[in-house]
Amino acid sequence: MTYEGAIGIDLGTTYSCVGVWQNERVEIIANDQGNRTTPSYVAFTDSERLIGDAAKNQVAMNPRNTVFDAKRLIGRKFSDPVVQSDMKHWPFKVITKGDDKPVIQVQFRGETKTFNPEEVSSMVLSKMKEIAESYLGKQVKKAVVTVPAYFNDSQRQATKDAGTIAGLEVLRIINEPTAAAIAYGLDKVEDGKERNVLIFDLGGGTFDVTLLTIDGGIFEVKATNGDTHLGGEDFDNRLVAHFTDEFKRKNKGKDLSTNLRALRRLRTACERAKRTLSSAAQATIEIDALFDNVDFQATITRARFEELCGELFRGTLQPVERVLQDAKMDKRAVHDVVLVGGSTRIPKVMQLVSDFFRGKELKKSIQPDEAVAYGAAVQAFILTGGKSKQTEGLLLLDVTPLTLGIETAGGVMTSLIKRNTTIPTKKSQIFSTYADNQPGVHIQVFEGERAMTKDCHLLGTFELSGIPPPPRGVPQIEVTFDLDANGILNVSAEEKGTGKRNQIVLTNDKGRLSRAEIERMVREAAKYEAEDKDQVRQIDAKNGLENYAFSMKNAVNDPNVAGKIEEADKKTITSAVEEALEWLNNNQEASKEEYEHRQKELENLCTPIMTNMYQGMAGAGMPGGMPGGMPGGMPGGMPGGMPGGMPGGMPGGMPGGMPGGMPGGANPSSSSGPEVEEVD
């Protein structure tokens, strides 16, 4: 059954979050671990693929094949200095296949595999989709996905492609601070006052500042700015570098940066220390056998942390100043400053922002980790035709973060759409040829704020050919830029004299995936999902056999049944159970069918003996007998599972007898699934 509405997904650098409009409000949906945010991590092992908490929990044991930060790669070129710098901090391998597109290389099921950043992001999106589906009990097909306001066209396109690979129709790409503004302003729609609101959004990997006016239900963005590469991870990097140096100093030059596992354990401890410093004046790091069997203990004060990250913290104020300049607004005219993103919990960041606005009290009424997904869910509800008094008349007027234009003679950037123009928008301009008898024109589309195109970002190129060769300056070529509500650009050009027309096809020279590549990735995503389901079924079958074996073992050793079961029967069951458990230990990777076959064999042997025993006990006047003949029925085999008692039957024990089910039930460690030991 398909869900008619759409979900809102905040696809974060370090954590992601999903929400849906239900019963006149937004529900932020918890994952299977009960957490309302899910790590944007994907891990590949010899036997399975893990996404979210499961992936992050095993990262220290498997650093090379655990991928995170895909958002810092998406829509970027391999040669980008930012990518080259990040690669020094990542334990996984990033390569290029010669087309300047970064791909991530991992070992998966014994093979070397490569994944595009879009594919990794699509895996995180499919996990968020799955979280929503288990909550709604329906299949989800549509979503609104958020991106940093300062994401460029390539990064937006790539995020949309990731949604397609995950099997989602992305109804809209919206800017994260704009989504947060909806979360903040939704309950203020009816007060009728015009408010100037500044959203300060500092997350795990990106930073955005957006200034908007909320007037009734109209959310009009005035200006936006930011840094697509600044966030909590950069603060973690400073801490990691600091403690790596300290370890070297304390341990005769031992360099732990050569050991990926040690580095990962240190990074996890640094992340924890950073969070502690938001509420305490100092934090202690303790890691056993960190490197070369040397234990590491160190303390860091909040003041030292603020010094290490001082320039990064202060750097957040420059986009705030630029936004106010672009909007031609004085800081005193800002009514509310709203903090969004986990990194705004850092006291120094709060102090800097408050001081900048002359001691203004910062608004913390919205949950910083969930505000973006909340706003995306509201927009998803509106875009699928949802009607509610709260969202009635809600109108979002967003802007483009970067100037868009084409290259003209001499490498000059001639802009058609200026930054902070409200979208959607369409602009046209007439150009002509530069040389006599020019049969065609080569149109190059750029985005950026610099005067020369060499300092701007190339989005794509296309040709308009077949122009009659007149003298220079005669042909009238109309170039049209059409920027949609997602902030994604379409460009067309027409020669007025001949009616010759062409438009840009965003191909691989722009770093975007081709249609064929997207289709291949969609097929592969479906294949991986099917393999994941097979893996779960195999584990269920294995646990089913183990649970059944332990239940039988506990049943025949139960003091309540002593003397009620023949010694020979007890020996038969005990011996069969021991044999099954030994086989299990030696066959951890057997198929689902093999586990089921083994369980069936064990059931066929145990069921008649156990049935006779219980009938004998019932005949002896066991209080209440066995109601309903053991629900789920024993004949035909007790269906797999038996968590905490006999499967499909005798839930909670036979009334009036054998309280609590068969004592011991299933072995605790097997009934509750594998235990996860936390790695420092």
Curated annotation (Swiss-Prot):
Entry keyword ATP-binding: yes
* Gene Ontology molecular function terms on file: ATP binding; ATP-dependent protein folding chaperone
What InterPro entries does the annotation carry? ATPase_NBD, Heat_shock_70_CS, HSP70_C_sf, HSP70_peptide-bd_sf, Hsp_70_fam
Cross-referenced CDD domains, in alphabetical order? Answer: ASKHA_NBD_HSP70_HSPA1
Q: Which UniProt keywords apply?
A: ATP-binding, Nucleotide-binding, Stress response
Its family remark reads: Belongs to the heat shock protein 70 family.
Supply the name of the protein. Answer: Heat shock 70 kDa protein
